[in-house]
């Protein structure tokens, strides 16, 4: 008769963390890209010469998906229960890593989308606002970077649950 230790479900939590990192980060990137893109399109009607300058929020939003991809790859390469023991601690560490990066990317994408939309529209009417918009976008992008850094730290904690 076998006993259930819970470690059989640990890879589920690890893979859930990888999925959460990618899905939530890409949701933030998609929202930021769509919202900023609408602003660029409507601004391009009034001032077509500013379209390339106003593409910055769209690019910054797109980078958020890459952060989620990085964490998802780090997590998925750390899950190999056949090669070494993978405990619940490891699964929870990977889950929290994915959630930290993914939800930070989602919130950063929402901020970038809203600021980018309003910023490029305002930039069409008052070009002096461009620098302020870029600074706000940088602070919004920093939110996702915080999630990426915490995600890397948390995923590196996996495997430290027991001395082997």
Curated annotation (Swiss-Prot):
One of its GO terms (cellular component) is vacuole. Keywords: Hydrogen ion transport, Ion transport, Membrane, Transmembrane, Transmembrane helix, Transport, Vacuole. Pfam families: ATP-synt_C. Residues 33-54, 117-128 are cytoplasmic. It is a multi-pass membrane protein. It comes from the Eukaryota. Signal peptide: none annotated. InterPro entries: ATPase_proteolipid_c-like_dom (IPR002379), ATPase_proteolipid_csu (IPR000245), ATPase_proteolipid_su_C_euk (IPR011555), F/V-ATP_Csub_sf (IPR035921). Residues 1-11, 76-94, 155-164 are lumenal. Expressed in leaf, root, flower and silique. SUPFAM superfamilies: F1F0 ATP synthase subunit C. It is found in: Vacuole membrane. GO terms for molecular function: proton-transporting ATPase activity, rotational mechanism. The chain crosses the membrane at residues 12-32, 55-75, 95-116, 129-154. The record marks 141 as: Essential for proton translocation. V-ATPase is a heteromultimeric enzyme composed of a peripheral catalytic V1 complex (components A to H) attached to an integral membrane V0 proton pore complex (components: a, c, c'', d and e). The proteolipid components c and c'' are present as a hexameric ring that forms the proton-conducting pore. Belongs to the V-ATPase proteolipid subunit family. Proton-conducting pore forming subunit of the membrane integral V0 complex of vacuolar ATPase. V-ATPase is responsible for acidifying a variety of intracellular compartments in eukaryotic cells. This is V-type proton ATPase subunit c3. It comes from Arabidopsis thaliana. The gene is VHA-c3.
